[in-house]
Amino acid sequence: EYLPETYSGDDVGRITKGAALMLKADMYLDMASYKKFHQGEEAKELWKEAASLAKKVIDLNLYGLENDFAFLFKAAANNNNKEVILAHQYMEDELTHMLPVLCSPSGVGVTGRGWASFCPTRDLVDSYEMTDGKTIYESSLYDMDHPWENRDARLKKTFMLPGVDILRPDGSYTPYMPHPAYNNPERINNEGGGITGYMYLKYNDLELEKVDASWTNFSLYRYAETLLIYAEALNEYEPYNAEIVWAVNQVRKRAGLPGVDSQLGNQE
């Protein structure tokens, strides 16, 4: 209760009231989940407390969802934008990390440098819904010849996908095509190299020249998680509460997905 709601100047990034409330909400959610799903015991009061703490963050009226999901993971977002509640703070030329070079194959971005160290799996890519809210296995919108179309808007902003135009060192945008031998270790550093054929755009700034010294902050708690903690906890102890749908649908709307049904039960 003694923490300030916001900081200014050099103190931006320190623990705020919202960050403390989020940490507590997260802890109560974990305790409730463990008690219910591992110990098989009633956890109603823990769910209730998790929801109450998340609601306190919402009621601060300090946070909101950024319109552009991709913006959250660029160096330009180091102003600790309205969605960020707590982030690991980095500073250009003083405290940096190497995520851009680790997330890219060679031949992309303004530098063309990349180590292809982090490669998402096909299962993860396939888990992103279609714009009708169905999976790729259920939706009539899914087209195997154009698998990235009519998908959750976050898909193309999170992953470097085969066939999708990507920034090149000469300033052009041409399709990213994994190397035919991308699963051969000796070709891993070749153009398009990568173990799975997919790479990350999240926390990867292709316009950044210092790819091995990025100062993009790493978000620990965002407002999107506040909404989802609130919805999950509330759903466990008070199913069909209208606030559940309200919270979930804010996140889905930004992703270009249809809202969940107001009669959605807590097992769905």
Task: Identify the function of each model-found stretch.
Residues 104-109:
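C-terminal/domain-terminus segments
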Residues 112:
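NTP-handling and nucleic-acid-processing catalytic cores
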Residues 1-103, 115, 132-268:
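Acidic/polar-rich alpha-helix caps and helix-coil junctions
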